[in-house]
Amino acid sequence: MPFIVNTASERDEMLKAIGVSSFDDLLVAIPEEIRLKRALDLFPASDEPQVRKLLEGLASANKSTADYVSFLGGGAYDHFIPAAIKTITSRSEFYTAYTPYQAEVSQGTLQAIYEYQSLVCRLYEMDVANASMYDGATALAEAVLMAMNVTGRSKVVVAGKLHPYNSSVLKTYLEAAGHHAVIQNTLEEGVGSIDALKELVGASVAAVVVQQPNFYGSLEDVEAIGAIAHENGALFVVSADPLSLGMLAAPGSYGADIAVGEGQPLGTPQSFGGPYLGIFTVKQQLVRKIPGRLVGMTKDRDGEDGFILTLQTREQHIRREKATSNICSNQALNALQAAIYLSLLGKEGLQQVATQSAQKAHYLAGKIAAIPGFSLKYKAPFFREFVVETPIPAAAVIERMLEHKLFAGHDLAVHGETGLLVAVTEKRTKAELDSFVDKLEGITGI
């Protein structure tokens, strides 16, 4: 950021304005014996061209998806982002993450959020969406807290394979709220066991949680899981990848009471892991328990359409002790990105992105499975992500593939498991997929 230092006369003017004669007068509260008397040992000052050259040199050590072909996933995906998204979101009237405190003054911001809510409801086939949460993990944690509040029960069952980081955030939220009962269902072939789930869900369970697709990219039996939840009076909470809904059934169609998701695939860059977008939707009967902000449409005194923050008595700035959540802000800029992305692509465009991602992922999976020493770890159907068992440690595969300017995937050893988690998006070309396979064959020496 450009910075011009204050002149001596400007400093004197500021000191005079606050009633002191020197900077030392501001330090009277600090004992003499602990004050630093010498000059700081700093390197010599540089001019702007030198600083720019230094920082650009440091930044060049970072390699992004603009430099390497990426097969990384695990919650952050390298989907194409239309240039129009950055152009629109960079407009000064949008360039803030905050809903204004006098919200109704900013009708444009409220309308943008309202459009986002409407699009998300259509995508998830749910009745109500809030203005957004911090990210997919916090949205899931807030969903479970909401389920406990609604049902008066204290346990949650995770039906399948949840993202480990989402699971960690969930446990942190629940422990802070005095709950410690997160029960993990048994996994079979990378998805939750329906028979085992039936034994776990009972009268004390507030919510049955499932991620679709799950962390491994596999597809859970969501209809069976939802039926078990409802048979036992629990709420059915689904964390669904929004981009997958261009191809897979929407949570509302198979009975989700609360549906959340990580909105990063909808026009938000990977950006070292954030900021991202927490999608949060519910059925109509739960609207007064939903956390976060809600934008509604109304009529002003002249009969014109207008937008307001509605049902604010749920929020902590109105009734702190009875608030549904302590979240009082939202990811408005990221929500705007998602709204623009969905509007630009439309229904058919989203279907094409999802279908291409799935088709290319299955093409690559088949090619990799044919390489001696490599195999798919699970047999369950998957969307655009799958786990590969490798003949050498996954970390070694990743390291060697970097030499070919390839991000090979996510090493599951980070989570105490074996395998390489590989993700494929619509951006990948057939030439890139074939090159990935060729390089895999070459690095293992089998």
Swiss-Prot record:
Lineage summary: Bacteria, Pseudomonadati, Chlorobiota, Chlorobiia, Chlorobiales
Keyword match ATP-binding: no
Keywords, sorted A to Z: Oxidoreductase
Gene source species: Pelodictyon phaeoclathratiforme (strain DSM 5477 / BU-1)
This protein's name: Probable glycine dehydrogenase (decarboxylating) subunit 1
Gene3D superfamilies: Aspartate Aminotransferase, domain 1, Type I PLP-dependent aspartate aminotransferase-like (Major domain)
Coiled-coil regions listed in the entry: none
Function: The glycine cleavage system catalyzes the degradation of glycine. The P protein binds the alpha-amino group of glycine through its pyridoxal phosphate cofactor; CO(2) is released and the remaining methylamine moiety is then transferred to the lipoamide cofactor of the H protein.
Organism superkingdom: Bacteria
Homology family: Belongs to the GcvP family. N-terminal subunit subfamily.
GO molecular function: glycine dehydrogenase (decarboxylating) activity
Encoding gene, per UniProt annotation: gcvPA
Enzyme class: oxidoreductase
